[in-house]
Amino acid sequence: ETDHGQQTRLFHFNAAELAGAGTLQGNSLASWDDRSLKVVTRAMTAGYVRRNGIPYSDKAVVTEWFDQHVSFGEDWITVTTVVDDPLNFTQKFVVSSSFKRLADDSSWNPQPCVSEWGPVKEGDRFND
């Protein structure tokens, strides 16, 4: 789950299962790349890479690698994300984030995706 825990992404391992139309989540095709889970997402509706307004177009392709590792005796997962958008970016946008496995879900507090106009749902458009 992403976005504070109330959205679900579906990774397909078979390209034949991908939907044709663009969505906020896009169509994600997953495969194993050595020990990394590689996920390539296409067919997203235009949106923002970050909350502060870096836009991406419906032509953007997001490639992610999910890597599990042990550091300092604890389980971690690192997600490396590359956004390639020929319409809005002059170069690829690359970021990595690391997450530590917790013993339980006692600190997990899922929140809905909201904007200043209320809850966000599929099909919403935010124009300036």
Model-derived features with residue positions:
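Hydrophobic small-molecule pocket/channel-lining residues, especially in calycin-type beta-barrels
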Residues: 1-128
